[in-house]
């Protein structure tokens, strides 16, 4: 007879089986910044859908104080990619309304702080770990679900960058 505790431990440590199909991930970060300031309380939103456009999981979470909205955008991407990995996704299309985020991941642009560079490196590593991936900029109007989720986690409406 097998030990149920040992079996439970085995299940917990298993790597998720890759899920077939192409998944989409929309991400957004928001910041409530006082007038004249770039930083403040921040939140992330992310929406993962399967190839049938059905919701797999969504995130709406405060992430504490950040120095600017770019940090919130990088954090949203990282949390969204981690969510996809937890679901065993290996083919993904990622959409964001942050041009700097797309350029930061796909191009060698200079970022202003060590925190930005560290988040970029972390996001790049996660992004590259997918078997098939594409990151694209979309207008804010095409990113409304992630935008609403990020905004919902904040005490007041976020600033836009």
For each feature predicted by the language model, list its residue ranges.
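RNase H-like nuclease fold core
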Residues: 12-71, 82-86
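RNase H catalytic domain
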Residues: 30-36, 78-151, 156-158
């Amino acid at each position: 007879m097998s030990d149920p505790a040992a079996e439970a431990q085995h299940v917990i440590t298993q790597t998720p089986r890759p899920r077939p199909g192409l998944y989409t991930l929309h991400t957004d970060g928001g910041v409530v910044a006082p007038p004249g300031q770039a930083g403040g309380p921040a939140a992330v939103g992310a929406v993962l859908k399967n190839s049938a456009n059905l919701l797999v999981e969504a995130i709406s979470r405060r992430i504490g104080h950040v120095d600017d909205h770019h940090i919130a955008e990088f954090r949203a991407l990282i949390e969204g990619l981690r969510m996809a990995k937890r679901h065993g996704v290996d083919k993904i299309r990622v959409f964001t309304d942050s041009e700097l985020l797309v350029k930061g991941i796909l191009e060698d642009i200079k970022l202003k702080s060590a925190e930005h560079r560290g988040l970029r490196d972390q996001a790049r590593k996660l992004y590259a770990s997918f078997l098939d991936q594409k990151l694209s900029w979309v207008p804010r109007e095409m990113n409304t679900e992630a935008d609403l989720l990020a905004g919902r986690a904040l005490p007041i409406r976020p600033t836009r960058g």
